Amino acid sequence: MTFLIQQTLIYAIPLMIVALAGVFAERSGIINLALEGIMIFGAFIGVLFVRLMQGSEAVLAAKQAGDWVALQGLELLTMLVAAAMGAVFSLLLSFASINLRADQTIGGTALNLMAPALVLFLIRIIANQNTLQMATGDSASWFMLKKSTFGVDKSVDWGFFGETFLNKIYLATYICILLFIILSVILYKTKFGLRLRACGENPQAADSLGINVYRMRYAGVTISGALAGMGGFVYAMTTANCSSNGDVAGFGFLALAVMIFGNWKPLNIAGASLLFGLFKCIAAAYASIDINGDGVFLLADIGISAHLYRMLPYLITLLVLAFTSKKSRAPKAEGIPYDKGTR
């Protein structure tokens, strides 16, 4: 059960934070179909930043001394860098959609096509191969919280809660959960959030009250890009073996499905992310999931084809959207370019 919960969180957290990214953009009135592309770019930037930092004196000293606080600081700094570059990358969509009033679906699709090509081009220049590794050696262990991080021997039993939520888990998981809560409160309990949502529902009415619709939409897409970029790095660190290869396994599109399934509401999105994370976990680790807890009968022993397990997350996506999309209520003005002269 510990393994299942930890792996579910590993898959659910990037989905949750990127789905919230989609909410911020669409609540402002812009369809951010480019979440996949921004994730790919954020993953690349995060991996490249750690790769560049691994040779610095501070990181080398922290590794040799076992200074886990400094390494966790590097993890947080990399999350911020990936978020910043994701925000910059999203400005391409903002400019095309807000200033040029281009079709937002086409603009997002263009970024989704450009991002993997650009990332692979840069990886070839940097590493002369198709995959960019974060660092030499087991870089995942740098950022993972373990018993040794807290000065406890690995033979000590922490019980179910400690073994599940404090051992062999990433600090980024809890940072993203905290960020998700804070941003959800900002979106629904602050003046900024009210203005942002007004621009996605009735921009003409918002404009008549003195709200700068263009500025609010830029803010929504920029926050969306920052979250998607951060989600891309978290995916690369926790799921993609600390590497970037111009692909995030469709997590950006899955996040869009989670957003729609969650009806653009943070609490629903959190639940949907855990559901999709569970099925991604089953698809990726079915051969290791112990059904009875005795280490004998594994999920793989049922006799179901491995291909079906790998299809599960995407089959569930289709089924969920088929049965819930009719009840979903998107912001009324999403996807519609705002013209100040129309009423």
Model-derived features: positions:
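Extracellular/periplasmic helix-loop junction at the C-terminal end of a transmembrane helix
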Residues: 116-161, 283-297, 326-335
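Cytosolic-side transmembrane-helix boundaries in multi-pass membrane proteins
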Residues: 183, 201-208, 213-215, 287-343
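Loop-to-helix entry region at the N-terminal start of transmembrane alpha-helices
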Residues: 3-11, 156-182, 309-314
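Helix-loop-helix "hairpin" substructures at the membrane interface of multi-pass membrane proteins
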Residues: 164-243, 271
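Alpha-helical transmembrane segments within multi-pass membrane transporters and channels
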Residues: 60-116
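Short loop segments and helix-boundary regions at transmembrane helix junctions
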Residues: 25-31, 91-152, 189, 249-250, ...
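Transmembrane alpha-helical segments in multi-pass inner-membrane proteins
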Residues: 228, 239-314
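Membrane-interfacial amphipathic/re-entrant helices at transmembrane-helix boundaries
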Residues: 1-18, 31, 45, 52-77
